[in-house]
A protein has these predicted regions:
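Basic, flexible Lys/Arg- and Gly-enriched helix-loop patches that mediate nucleic-acid binding at interfaces
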Residues: 1-242
Length: 242
């Protein structure tokens, strides 16, 4: 059986990012077959792995991560609604495709980068707020924008008992009554960007996610198209999480 780096096994088991798991190993809290593990060691399912005296499950799966360019008018649900198609209709034809997990849902009117994976631990790792995966969007909106509005968006606006804020916003040139913005945020609440803009009198007409953490929407990937990410991209994801 092919051996796997210990930090990868710990990350798959839900003990944090690869970087965080490396620190756990270096602390001397992990044992393999009764001996204190060294950073860089590899293990397989026959090895007894313990963290703080508790057994760590060896998850032996081939992690797959797909990026899909979601079109507007498609919902992130297995069920269709009216004339709206399901994002699952666009999935790659692989074994157990219906068991792929959505990571980074977008509302029906938004488009752009969405992840799918067969690894539940990876999906939890990417989605967990503590790992600080920032998201970048292109937003087209109608209305007047000024420094005061920008400051409001960055410091936070209380909406529906929640403090919503952007981590960055760059305003582009204005064309007629519309303007394009490059927007970043660290959370993924439902319709968060739209709510922030609308609270400041700006009406969003287009919203497209172009980056999630270290992964950009691939150039040339058509709407409705997908691509499987390589192992080096998986390493980027695990290393990116704080």
């Amino acid at each position: 059986m092919k051996k796997t780096r210990l930090q990868k096994v710990l990350a798959r088991a839900g003990f944090g990012s690869r970087r965080g798991c490396e620190e756990i190993i270096s602390s001397g809290k992990v044992t393999v077959n009764g001996e204190i593990a060294k950073l860089g060691c590899s293990v397989d399912a026959d090895d007894e792995i313990k963290l703080g005296g508790k057994t760590v499950e060896f998850v032996d799966i081939q992690t797959r991560l797909f990026v899909l360019n979601k079109p507007a008018g498609v919902i992130c649900s297995k069920k269709t609604e009216g004339n709206l198609k399901s994002i699952y209709d666009l999935l790659p034809k692989i074994d157990n495709e219906k068991n792929l997990i959505i990571v980074g849902r977008l509302d029906a009117n938004s488009s752009g980068l969405i992840f799918f994976t067969n690894d539940g631990k990876l999906s939890e790792f990417i989605a967990h707020p503590s790992n600080l995966f920032d998201r970048e969007y292109l937003v087209r909106a109608r209305g007047n924008f000024n420094d005061e509005i920008k400051e409001n968006m960055l410091t936070g606006i209380k909406i529906d008992s929640q403090l919503l804020r952007l981590s960055d916003i760059i305003a582009g040139d204005k064309t007629s009554s519309n303007r394009w913005y490059t927007v970043c945020l660290l959370t993924g609440r439902n319709r968060e960007i739209r709510k922030i803009f609308e609270s400041q009198g700006l009406q969003v007409s287009r919203l497209k996610r172009v980056r999630f953490g270290p992964i950009f929407l691939p150039k040339g990937l058509k709407e409705g198209g997908w691509a499987e990410l390589k192992s080096k991209d998986l390493e980027k994801m695990y290393s990116y999480g704080k």
